[in-house]
Amino acid sequence: MDYLPIFCQLQHKACLLVGGGEIAERKARLLLDAGAALTVNACSFTPQFHEWAALGRLTLAAGEFSAELLAEKWLVIAATDRVEVNALVYQCANQQRVFCNVVDDPKRASFIMPSIIDRSPIMVAVSSGGKAPVLARLLREKLEAVLPQHLGKLAQLGGSLRQRVKKHFSDIGSRRRFWEKLFAHDRLAQSLANNDVALAERQIEQLFSHQPQECGEVVLVGAGPGDAGLLTLKGLQQIQQADVVVYDRLVSDEIMTLVRRDAERIFVGKRAGHHCVPQEQINQILLQQAQLGKRVVRLKGGDPFIFGRGGEELETLADANIPFSVVPGITAASGCSAYSGIPLTHRDHAQSVRLVTGHAKSDGGLDWSTLAAGQQTLVFYMGLTQAADIQRQLIAHGMPAATPVALVENGTSCRQRVIEGELSQLGTLALQAASPSLIIVGSVVSLRSKLNWFSSQEPSQPLAQMA
């Protein structure tokens, strides 16, 4: 860690800004917002500085910089377009042990200014240590889009309720659940955003008067196909609020690192032909944990309602009157095809797409004549062990043996591998692939050579050494 991130209390503290141009103006806004007693030194000033001075918000010190201006100052920012002046400010500040920042010159700075997301009292600072300021700005823009504007009001509300919550709830677990409900209360957040104080107060009282929940709840969350970046925002929120996370082997390690640290983790991994934990037992685990009053997340790879047996698990909960909800995820067909450069539909190749399980019930025969029809894309989930039979059935029902096919192994991850060939080779190709793999059949596979964009190869040496 090159820099220690700290938040400074500048209310009424004497600060100096050297520079009177547009860049200095931006720094002045930050210092004024933080309540600094600001003096600005420059030979000339933008109209905005004169306006602030007229309002009594800052003091202008016209003329060249001199070390005397640093007397009794808490910090200084040098923001001129003259390198020699900025260097002099830094030198004098060091001699007088005053914190100094030189704009766009981190080597001449005892502190640097991060990109800031201001939702006071919630503050988020993003810094690259001066190495990639544009990247820091882009990250700030992404966070700005995610964090609602009323977040500050919500934090202020939380601060005002701390003592009451401490008296009302005797144990830490109850307090934590109250705070999670308060901060996740969509209608309360909307009331604050609308400045509807009366409604917000009623909603808060309802939270305090709410009787302890005898029964917990289960949230079925789709983790997506592998890349942690494909986990939905709502899915992330749920796994960070869970008391218990029940997950299988298709959930990547990267996603599991996002789970709340003190949550209990129950692994129920399954493989085709070998069920580590029987489905009925998984259903009972969900039921029992919810009956203990816990917030349970059933985390599944892909989308839980597409060959994820999510419906079966929810039926058990519904029969027992356990509250549940579903957060959909990006299914493997969508994620793997996108990361392989294979569009599932295309005006010149496929007007429909069919998602097919390679492990249908023994009495659930597939309509192979329909599957073998042209102008469509077939995606087989869990089809490796049945690949030879899939090949035989499709060719027997009229699909050309030369139809392009692709097997996507560990799709969307850094270990992704794509094996291409023709339908007549599918059974043999499957022997080269490992689970989890997805089989894509159709002429859209031929577009991969032109549309592939994702490189699954990790760099063999640090990027810094390549530069």
Curated annotation (Swiss-Prot):
Span list, region Uroporphyrinogen-III C-methyltransferase: 216-467
Pathway(s) annotated for this protein in UniProt: Cofactor biosynthesis; adenosylcobalamin biosynthesis; precorrin-2 from uroporphyrinogen III: step 1/1; Cofactor biosynthesis; adenosylcobalamin biosynthesis; sirohydrochlorin from precorrin-2: step 1/1; Porphyrin-containing compound metabolism; siroheme biosynthesis; precorrin-2 from uroporphyrinogen III: step 1/1; Porphyrin-containing compound metabolism; siroheme biosynthesis; siroheme from sirohydrochlorin: step 1/1
A GO biological process held by the record: methylation
Alphabetical list of Gene3D superfamilies matching this protein: Cobalt-precorrin-4 Transmethylase, Domain 1, Methyltransferase, Cobalt-precorrin-4 Transmethylase, Domain 2, NAD(P)-binding Rossmann-like Domain, Sirohaem synthase, dimerisation domain, Siroheme synthase, domain 2
SUPFAM superfamilies listed in its UniProt record: NAD(P)-binding Rossmann-fold domains (SSF51735), Siroheme synthase middle domains-like (SSF75615), Tetrapyrrole methylase (SSF53790)
EC number: 2.1.1.107, 1.3.1.76, 4.99.1.4
Binding site for S-adenosyl-L-methionine: P225, G301, G302, D303, I306, T331, A332, M382, G411
Any matching Pfam family: Sirohm_synth_M
Chain positions recorded as NAD(+) binding sites: E22, I23, C43, S44
Residues of the active site: D248 (proton acceptor), K270 (proton donor)
Catalysis: reaction(s): uroporphyrinogen III + 2 S-adenosyl-L-methionine = precorrin-2 + 2 S-adenosyl-L-homocysteine + H(+); precorrin-2 + NAD(+) = sirohydrochlorin + NADH + 2 H(+); siroheme + 2 H(+) = sirohydrochlorin + Fe(2+)
UniProt keyword list: Cobalamin biosynthesis, Lyase, Methyltransferase, Multifunctional enzyme, NAD, Oxidoreductase, Phosphoprotein, Porphyrin biosynthesis, S-adenosyl-L-methionine, Transferase
Domain of life: Bacteria
Example GO molecular function: NAD binding
Ranges for region Precorrin-2 dehydrogenase /sirohydrochlorin ferrochelatase: 1-204
PTM annotation (Phosphoserine): residues: S128
Matches recorded under NCBIfam families: cobA_cysG_Cterm, cysG_Nterm, PRK06136.1, PRK10637.1
UniProt record similarity statement: In the N-terminal section; belongs to the precorrin-2 dehydrogenase / sirohydrochlorin ferrochelatase family.
Free-text function comment from the UniProt entry: Then it catalyzes the NAD-dependent ring dehydrogenation of precorrin-2 to yield sirohydrochlorin. Finally, it catalyzes the ferrochelation of sirohydrochlorin to yield siroheme.
Protein name per Swiss-Prot or TrEMBL: Siroheme synthase 2
Gene that encodes it: cysG2
